[in-house]
């Protein structure tokens, strides 16, 4: 390697790890710190955990070094790692992200698995508030012969979901639509799913800074006075646009499970099942339309 080439490669990954650890050790849990490190070197250097174990003295380019150092600054500012790298994994699929869409959560994976385990085939499925497309794309990927549609309220969000459908090689019909101003449809769905905003503004004080400062509030929070506002709209729409004996799946705020179930019963849904997430919190509901 020439002297000129040497100038392009100045830091080893081990040296970067030491810098990374020293900067962030007081801010990030040790186990999480290592996960973040390996996520970053895989993203920016295409260097896996095993590659690092076998050769931590690998020299990175100046561009890679700058990207990695910039990522430290972002993490120190409490930006979620998923926004730092611009992507995340969900249901073993890769989804591109920016801060116009929520970061998909493990609880939502549980909701998706519930739908998949119910083995819907040859169904028309609607995802209301699709965001990154994580629910719609995953259902299209893992269910047989289902037509999946995703709705959201802005072109920017639809573009992200569309890109994620393309990346994961699935066909999802993505449409601009606002459930608070539902449009008339002349057809009905077999399955409707939604993970709507459900955190009250009173609960905002308990939300971590990296969520509160970076994730889109419009996808997170509802007014204290009407915490079920989106559920009311979704249930009314589902009453008109779900087929008889069609399925409704929703993610919920654990503090309002009884109220959501009562609302479903009042709207005429039956066989209502409440399911806990991996943290043992009431998190998702399945119901059937009469």
Predicted regions and their residues:
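Conserved beta-strand segments of alpha/beta enzyme cores
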Residues: 94, 147, 171-173, 270-273
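Conserved AdoMet
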Residues: 43-114
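Conserved SAM/SAH cofactor-binding pocket of Class I
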Residues: 107-206, 233
């Amino acid at each position: 390697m020439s002297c000129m080439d040497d100038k392009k490669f100045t830091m080893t990954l081990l040296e970067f790890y030491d810098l990374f650890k020293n900067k962030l050790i007081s801010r990030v849990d040790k186990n999480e710190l290592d996960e973040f490190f390996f996520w970053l070197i895989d993203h920016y250097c295409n260097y896996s955990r095993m590659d690092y174990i076998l050769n931590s003295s690998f020299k990175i380019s100046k561009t890679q070094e700058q990207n990695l150092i910039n990522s430290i600054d972002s993490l120190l500012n409490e930006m979620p790692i998923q926004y730092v790298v611009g992507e995340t994994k969900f249901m073993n699929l890769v989804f591109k992200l920016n801060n116009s869409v929520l970061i998909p959560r493990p609880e939502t994976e549980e909701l998706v698995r519930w739908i998949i385990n119910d083995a819907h085939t040859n169904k028309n499925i609607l995802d209301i508030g699709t965001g990154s497309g994580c629910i719609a794309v995953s259902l299209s990927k893992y269910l047989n012969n289902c037509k999946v549609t995703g709705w959201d309220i802005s072109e920017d969000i639809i573009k992200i979901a569309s890109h994620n459908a393309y990346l994961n090689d699935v066909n999802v019909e993505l449409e601009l639509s606002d459930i608070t101003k539902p449009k008339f449809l002349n057809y009905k769905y077999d399955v409707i799913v939604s993970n709507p905003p459900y955190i009250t503004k009173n609960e905002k004080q308990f939300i971590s800074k990296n969520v509160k400062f970076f994730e889109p509030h419009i996808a997170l929070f509802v007014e204290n006075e009407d915490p079920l506002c989106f559920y009311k709209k979704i249930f009314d729409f589902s009453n008109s646009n779900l087929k008889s004996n069609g399925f409704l799946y929703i993610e919920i705020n654990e503090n309002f499970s009884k109220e959501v179930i009562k609302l479903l019963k009042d709207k005429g849904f039956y066989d209502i099942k409440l399911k806990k997430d991996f943290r043992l919190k009431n998190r998702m509901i399945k119901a059937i339309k009469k």
